[in-house]
Amino acid sequence: MSSKAKKIFLVMSIIVPFLLYCVYYYGMMVKNAPYKFSEFKSIQFEYGYGDSLLNKYDSRTGDYQFVNTRDSVIKMKLKLTKDDFLYLHRKAADLGFWDFPAKELAPTRKTRSPRYVIQFNYQRKSKSVIFDEAYDGHEKLVDANQRLIKELQKVLEEAEARQKNSK
């Protein structure tokens, strides 16, 4: 058997089956992913101090309620675009939101700190996280939560500005 024939045999018997297996394995993983954007339904985001979560957004209904700088509760309808939802879905995936614990609360309620409830709803599943700003868990987890919260708030502010400019 020549050297060229040996190389071809090696490629055909080891490398090609390995590549086929990789395509099959990762194809099944992507196909069966629990949180796919194609199955996305809505986002619910609430935050405030203690149990009074006065700032709320529900993308299913478009209801947006927040406390402004004068401590007045403002209610309005706010619709996000598909691009906004895709951005938030990808940002949540990048930050590992699907692996966050469901409750990330402070050990004691002595300090007055903001509490956030973030919920992503899909056809087959939902993921909800309750995050307390005074949570003393792993530093990377706290940072990921804070970054996701900032992204959600930024998208809501941009959508509010878009809506005001279009009127």
Protein language model features and the residues they cover:
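Short, well-ordered, aromatic-rich surface patches in folded extracellular/luminal domains
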Residues: 2-14, 20-47, 104-167
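Extracytoplasmic/periplasmic/luminal assembly and interaction segments
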Residues: 49-99
